[in-house]
Amino acid sequence: MALSYRLRKQRILSESLAFLAIFSVGIAAAAQSPEGIDPITGPRTRLSGVWVGEEEVSPDLQILVLAGHADSQRMAGAGTSGAAVDLQGAAPMDPRMRDELFWNRKIRDALVEQGRLRGLKIRGYDPGQLSIAEASDPRTNWSVARRQSALGDYVLEIHFDAYSPHGYGSGLIPPLNRRLNRVDESLANAFGRFPRLFRGGLGGPRRGIGILEIGMLEGNLEAKLRDPRTREVTIEAIADRIADALLLGIRPERPKPLTRKPTIPKGPDQESKDRRKHDPALYVHH
């Protein structure tokens, strides 16, 4: 399984060398930038939370991944269309849905595939219908999240934030129905940390959903997603970062135990005495 993951990753990287070279320049520029804007996902949330996730989780934690707005198309709460569609007149990626949902689904599927290859107990969910009027319908993201969170699953919903000036940036909006854990903390370290009571407490987090805003759907991030030459590597890079954060939260790297230093006996050892008998140079007086 680990071999399959490595081969898949090598294939993606080999097909995208030119793009990755550009990425390297972007990363170097970001490192020198006082704002520290991420070269892939852009700025982190401008509203920063102060919570800390400390609860340890089981190494066999079950993870459920949802695509935000999967059941609310052509109705209130359909998600953002992105700057390309709204401001630049571009055609939607799929006329049945807002661009945000199109990309949410792509990231969800890539994350589930990567996570499984890397040993995570992870699965995705799709309501099977783009518009479900009743939030209490058992097929909606909210209903499924409430049930699975009560069973102890970690429920993560993928989102892209609105474009400027409406959006805030990348980051995790954590659940409100439980104590925050190491996975929440790891995702916040990787993407940013929204206030726990963002907008007074959203419906998803009240039902056990951690909302992961990948970034504002605009600029370089949106351009790389829309460009067929860079689309796959961008999706995989985002999914890879999420998978890394999930793994680190579930199986944190422990500091290696200090090796016991050998005890040094007092006085000269026998080997030293024997050498001195045969090597007068060892008897140097200062």
Where does each model-flagged region fall?
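Catalytic-site microenvironment of enzymes
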Residues: 2-286
